[in-house]
Design a protein with these regions (language model features):
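A short alpha-helical cap/connector motif
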Residues: 1-83, 87-111, 115-254
Length: 254
């Protein structure tokens, strides 16, 4: 399943009421939205037909998030589904994550693209290949270290994988407050030391099976009822973790 097929499946099973896209390019992913949408890109070149109520913003994501009330055109200013495919460098992707999280609820879903590079060359910070993920894959490790309260799921989509983030907390400031420390630890010169589990997608879930998991119904139900994070995510997290174990290409330890 490719990235666009998986995103289409997410729109189908999760039925977001609002959608944020960072990094529009030619609009192929944006064309999947059928809901109120904000799309951000400093140099978009949309060629796909669009089918959503859209605010298209020509700006960098940093400049967009620096605006007062950047999500004011969305229902209650809350992002249900976010697709982050901006500049392919770790620090930019990390900032996009914690800036987006401030406009979410725990039932929101964030999707990061290009999280499973296929080679060390493809993961280089200094691009020298045609296909390029950069070092954004390291965001998963940073979240595991600094935000274990989040549940991150690697998805084996073609060509370069994706990461889903569940359990967002709009009040959490750990990532922004620790940004300089995280940057110093994770931003290193090429060649990048890409873990073998990333290159082999050892613990990534099968996208078709994961979209068919039962927890999506419970997640959308909790979202629509506006259940609080405390009890809601604590109850739902084991269901998502069980889906990860059953859908992983290779069994996930623990």
């Amino acid at each position: 399943m490719n990235r666009y097929e998986f995103l289409k499946g997410l729109h189908r099973v999760y039925r977001p009421r609002t959608y944020l896209e960072i990094g529009v390019n030619d609009g192929r992913s944006l064309a999947l939205s059928r809901t109120r949408t904000i799309a951000v890109d400093p140099a978009f070149k949309v060629t796909a037909a669009l089918h959503c109520d859209l605010e298209l913003v020509k700006a960098t994501s940093d400049d967009f998030f620096a605006r007062p009330r950047p999500m004011r055109s969305l229902r209650r200013g809350v992002v249900d589904l976010a697709f982050i495919d901006g500049l392919h460098l770790f620090e930019y992707a990390l900032r996009d994550v914690f800036h987006t999280e401030r406009h979410t609820r725990w039932t929101s879903v964030m999707v990061l693209d290009d999280m499973l590079p296929r080679s060390v060359d493809e993961a280089a910070r200094d691009r020298h290949t045609d296909a390029w993920t950069g070092d954004v894959y390291k965001v998963a490790a940073a979240l595991a270290e600094y935000r274990p309260d989040l549940l991150c799921v690697a998805v084996d989509t073609t060509p370069t994988g994706q990461l889903l983030i569940f359990g967002a907390d709009s009040r959490n400031r750990v990532l922004s407050h620790s940004y300089d420390e995280i940057y110093a630890k994770y931003v290193v010169p090429d060649p990048q030391q890409v873990p073998q589990d990333i290159l082999t997608r050892r613990h990534a879930v099968d996208p078709v099976a994961f979209l068919a998991a039962d927890f999506w119904h419970e997640l959308t139900h909790a979202r629509d009822r506006i259940l609080r994070r405390g009890g809601g995510f604590e109850q739902l997290r084991p269901q998502i973790e069980a889906a990860v174990r059953s859908c992983a290409r290779v069994p996930v330890p623990g």
